[in-house]
Swiss-Prot record:
The lineage of its organism: Bacteria, Bacillati, Cyanobacteriota, Cyanophyceae, Acaryochloridales. Keywords: Membrane, Photosynthesis, Photosystem I, Thylakoid, Transmembrane, Transmembrane helix. Belongs to the PsaL family. The chain crosses the membrane at residues 80-102, 117-139. This is Photosystem I reaction center subunit XI. GO terms for cellular component: photosystem I reaction center; plasma membrane-derived thylakoid membrane.
Amino acid sequence: MAEELVKPYNGDPFVGHLSTPISDSGLVKTFIGNLPAYRQGLSPILRGLEVGMAHGYFLIGPWVKLGPLRDSDVANLGGLISGIALILVATACLAAYGLVSFQKGGSSSDPLKTSEGWSQFTAGFFVGAMGSAFVAFFLLENFSVVDGIMTGLFN
């Protein structure tokens, strides 16, 4: 039975990928195709902005709840500072990857595979991650107000 469900991708066993009912489903293909890394028509800076917004927003929570300042009054600020530090490190790593992977003046059909395109992606990532980290901090600091708005307290 497993032989019928799991087979080589496109019938080629040398690709190194298996076709399964999950990986070949239309839902999974649509989901992955809509991720910013694979979506058609996005400029590198918009890809970076979208990826950065997602990462900056979810980086703050673990630092607030699990970080060394989790039981203090300044846990949110500590989470913000730690998140900013991690965003700076990630941006430096993205920039270093772009410097060593793509040659200046190189041409490619994919703008993300050029030095200029990767630089734009990195800039977008930095702006998006920093912005969403500050949004997450603002929401955590003003949680009672936001909760009141959502539960209809101010109607």
